[in-house]
Amino acid sequence: VDDRFSLIVGLDASNPELYGSIRGAGFEEATAFAERAIDALGSRAHVQAVRSELTEGGLEEFYKHWKQRTENVVIQKYDHFCRRLPQIRVGDLTPLNRFPCWHLQRDLHVLVDGRVPLCREDISTQVLLGNVFTDGLEKTWAAGAGHYADHVAGTFSGICQECDEYYTFSF
């Protein structure tokens, strides 16, 4: 496996009851997959739980359980997708002063058919930057420049007004 490849296995719980209430069936398969990923990828494999009202009571158990197996335990903040999902976050980590979105600056979210929405938060594809298959990567990437320039100018319109992910980024 290429050394640049890493994998995050989203589990959200270390017990079948909590896992089932969040994700449904499949706890045994998911945890077995996480174990195999750790064995195969070592430090490039991560296990993750999303911190929310649903998981808060089990996070310490999750962390302790997986920390025995790997250093790569990720506790991720809850994402409400610009208020399209219920707000069930436990704490507000939003910076006091708004700044331009890390995702508009660094990320390109490509759907399986090649369409590229404004960002990963645009789950309804309200703003399409283009299609990497028909428009090409450079043209599609360039189509987002105006949105980022708006952010630099302090203008946050559309779904960006409700976004709580602008300050997060993936390494």
PLM region descriptions:
Residues 102-104:
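Short, small/polar residue-rich loop motifs at catalytic or cofactor-binding pockets
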Residues 11-15, 51, 79, 114, ...:
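Short, flexible active-site-adjacent loop segments at beta-strand->alpha-helix junctions, enriched
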Residues 110-111:
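Short, acidic, Ser/Thr-enriched surface-loop or helix-capping motifs
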Residues 33-35, 39-46, 66-91, 96, ...:
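C-terminal accessory region of radical SAM enzymes
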Residues 1-64, 72:
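Radical SAM/AdoMet-radical enzyme domain recognition
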